[in-house]
């Protein structure tokens, strides 16, 4: 069977979708949007999309045959059958207005993902933290077991060189986004809930009980024969278990977990541990990821694979050979600078719990290194809502360079900006943070901060990821200093 024939065969899963020929994405450059677009391109649809700037996602989609527009305009939706919108897109976007005027259906990203999942065996991974890593680990195990899954991930799976892939099997493994409650569109066979914390609370009217109930509703989207895989170590998830009217498999370090981790040891960038499962032999494992939080992510993947009768050999091999995900404790190299050797790591975590987990992983793996963090807060609302948590967590590094908040389209909030956060950390008295008003100044500041043996951790969900790559290209800013 040729590749084209394989894709044509997949399209017959949803015969009515054959009426749809051209699909347009507004905000196509995001990882989640781009991933779905890539799957649809490979299924044979004519895909177009727009974004405010070119990036690696748009370049890849263009190379696959998608038509990419830089900038938003009403003419971009001419002749399309459906428009898919990102949650980041405002209602007054000209393409949205034009689609409404032309009576073109407008759907959210999760609705399109739900259509891809409708006639497949869907595995949907939800939770405040760990979604991308857990989804990537599950996809890697299924790939190792030759299940050839389709996957849509919110980060670059290094082994595949992409964050999305169209497989030939019935499996679809994807992240489920709770940020706008759109994960309620999904109808999976297996759900994973890694943890539940207060985040994206504007979606839930500031009501944490509503957030918890929405997660229960998400798990009740399972058929009666489906399985909810949940982390029993998380106190909120544990509290919700009696409310879940489906089969539940628990995982964690807790003694009552169905899939339990024992004998955890971190060795640099890797972790070793033993897995105990009910009715199964214990497994001795190594996962090529640092930190106790990544052992939990691994347990979730192991629980899903075990429920699907995947061989232990495939699980062990996939975890040991896992090549990581872009911007998830991504080691960008060691650099010999005039001040000495510095190790550079890039990480996407932007919630206090995620930042703390990254700090703990760095401390456990490299206890002798001084930890220098360049942190860029993400969204004014998150900074406001979790302000004291950020002050406490960011005070735990050895040296802090604090950037201004990455707005992500939000209006600045007085008292929730980078300067205010820097001032509060200074008043706490554990360290003297350095405030950087614009990202471009980071490369000029670091040469005066770094010393031999440091671990430099670039942390955040905004454009600090691009800054970390620039740092790697300029020898952590020293090359710029020498050229001036």
From Swiss-Prot:
Class in the EC hierarchy, top level: ligase
Keywords for this protein: ATP-binding, Cell cycle, Cell division, Cell shape, Cell wall biogenesis/degradation, Cytoplasm, Ligase, Nucleotide-binding, Peptidoglycan synthesis
Reaction catalysis annotation: UDP-N-acetyl-alpha-D-muramate + L-alanine + ATP = UDP-N-acetyl-alpha-D-muramoyl-L-alanine + ADP + phosphate + H(+)
Gene3D superfamilies: Mur ligase, C-terminal domain, Mur-like, catalytic domain, NAD(P)-binding Rossmann-like Domain
GO BP annotation list: cell division; cell wall organization; peptidoglycan biosynthetic process; regulation of cell shape
UniProt-listed InterPro entries: Mur-like_cat_sf (IPR036565), Mur_ligase_C (IPR004101), Mur_ligase_C_dom_sf (IPR036615), Mur_ligase_cen (IPR013221), Mur_ligase_N (IPR000713), MurCDEF_pg_biosynth (IPR050061), UDP-N-AcMur_Ala_ligase_MurC (IPR005758)
Pfam families (alphabetical): Mur_ligase, Mur_ligase_C, Mur_ligase_M
Pathway in which this enzyme or protein is active: Cell wall biogenesis; peptidoglycan biosynthesis
EC number: 6.3.2.8
GO CC term, one of those recorded: cytoplasm
Subcellular location: Cytoplasm
Highest taxon of the lineage: Bacteria
Gene Ontology molecular functions: ATP binding; UDP-N-acetylmuramate-L-alanine ligase activity
Protein family (similarity comment): Belongs to the MurCDEF family.
UniProt function note: Cell wall formation.
Name listed for the protein in its UniProt record: UDP-N-acetylmuramate--L-alanine ligase
């Amino acid at each position: 069977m040729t590749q084209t024939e394989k894709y044509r065969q997949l399209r017959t899963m949803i015969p009515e979708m054959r009426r749809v020929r051209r699909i347009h994405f507004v905000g196509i450059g995001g990882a989640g949007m781009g991933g779905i677009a890539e799957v649809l391109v490979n299924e044979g649809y004519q895909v177009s999309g727009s974004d405010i700037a070119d990036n690696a996602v748009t370049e890849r989609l263009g190379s696959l045959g998608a038509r990419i527009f830089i900038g938003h305009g009403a003419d971009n939706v001419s002749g399309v059958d459906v428009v898919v919108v990102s949650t980041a897109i405002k209602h007054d976007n000209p393409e949205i207005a034009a689609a409404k005027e032309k009576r073109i259906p407008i759907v959210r990203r999760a609705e399109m993902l739900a259509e891809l999942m409708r006639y497949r065996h869907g595995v949907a991974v939800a939770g405040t933290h760990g979604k991308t890593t857990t989804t990537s680990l599950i996809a890697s195990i299924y790939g190792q077991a030759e299940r050839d899954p389709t996957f849509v991930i919110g980060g670059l799976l290094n082994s595949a060189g992409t964050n999305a892939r169209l497989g030939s099997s019935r499996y679809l493994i994807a992240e489920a986004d709770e940020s706008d409650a759109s994960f309620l569109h999904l109808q999976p066979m297996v759900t994973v809930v890694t943890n539940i914390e207060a985040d994206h609370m504007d979606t839930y009217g500031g009501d944490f009980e509503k957030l918890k109930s929405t997660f229960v509703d998400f798990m009740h989207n399972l058929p009666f024969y489906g399985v909810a895989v949940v982390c029993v170590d998380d106190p909120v998830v544990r509290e919700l278990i009696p409310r879940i009217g489906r089969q539940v498999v628990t995982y964690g370090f807790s003694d009552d977990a169905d899939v339990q981790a024992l004998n955890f040891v971190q060795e640099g960038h890797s972790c070793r541990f033993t897995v105990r499962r009910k009715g199964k032999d214990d497994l001795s494992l190594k996962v090529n990821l640092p930190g106790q939080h990544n052992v939990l992510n691994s347990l979730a993947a192991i629980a899903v694979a075990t429920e699907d009768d995947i061989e232990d050999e495939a699980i062990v091999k996939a975890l040991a050979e896992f090549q990581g995900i872009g911007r998830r404790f991504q080691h960008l190299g060691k650099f010999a600078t005039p001040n000495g050797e510095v190790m550079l790591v890039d990480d996407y975590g932007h919630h206090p719990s995620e930042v703390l987990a990254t700090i703990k992983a760095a401390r456990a793996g490299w206890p002798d290194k001084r930890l220098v963090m360049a942190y860029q807060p993400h969204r004014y609302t998150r900074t406001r809502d979790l302000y004291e948590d950020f002050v406490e967590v960011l005070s735990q590094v050895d040296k802090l360079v604090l950037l201004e908040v990455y707005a992500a389209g939000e209006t600045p909030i007085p008292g929730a900006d980078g300067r205010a956060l820097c001032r509060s950390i200074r008043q706490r008295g554990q360290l003297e943070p350095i405030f950087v008003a614009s990202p471009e100044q980071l490369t000029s500041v670091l040469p005066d901060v770094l010393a031999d043996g440091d671990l430099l951790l670039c942390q955040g969900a905004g454009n600090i990821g691009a800054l970390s790559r620039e740092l790697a290209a300029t020898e952590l800013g020293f090359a710029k200093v020498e050229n001036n």
